[in-house]
């Protein structure tokens, strides 16, 4: 797996993806499919393509790239290494690419449910959401869903987002 910029144990997107990759490797091993997992922590966005290439050149059959920011580098690597399978987490491809599977999650729906729950539990009519940066589309979608879910339960609720 190639992480987005940051560490694999970031308690966020990189870590969630890595835990999924490790889980897959363990499960595949129970079916007598020899599978191993490793990661490269990306230190700078300019290194996405290089890091993906390191795994592709080492003979990996499949590479997971974590985050929407790796989308272009993933597609470029897929074209350069057609025998390697790629999974792009939070990546959407406008055109189908045979060796790329993009995983998109409905963050707005998860946010809606969280906001609805928070509003239904509020005793003051005020709830809050602590979100990450507004530069990350999935975080924005979750936040919008949160507000919509809260307002669905209580149209007058005050929602504080940070």
Regions found by a protein language model. Give the residues of each.
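A residue-level marker of the well-folded mature domains of exported/periplasmic proteins
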Residues: 1-162
């Amino acid at each position: 797996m190639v992480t987005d910029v940051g560490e694999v144990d970031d308690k966020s997107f990189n870590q969630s993806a890595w835990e999924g990759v490790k889980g897959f490797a363990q499960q595949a091993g129970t079916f007598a499919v020899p599978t191993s997992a490793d990661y490269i922590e990306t230190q700078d966005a300019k290194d996405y393509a290089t890091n993906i290439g390191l795994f592709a050149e080492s003979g990996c059959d499949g590479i997971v790239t974590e985050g929407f920011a790796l989308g272009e580098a993933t597609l470029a690597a897929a074209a350069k290494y057609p025998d390697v399978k790629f999974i792009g987490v939070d990546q959407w491809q406008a055109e189908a690419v045979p060796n790329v599977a993009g995983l998109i999650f409905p963050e707005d729906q998860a946010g809606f449910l969280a906001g609805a729950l928070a509003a239904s539990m509020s005793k003051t009519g005020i709830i809050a959401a602590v979100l990450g940066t507004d530069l990350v589309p999935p975080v924005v979608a979750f936040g919008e869903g949160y507000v919509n879910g809260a307002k669905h339960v209580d149209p007058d609720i005050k929602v504080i987002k940070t």
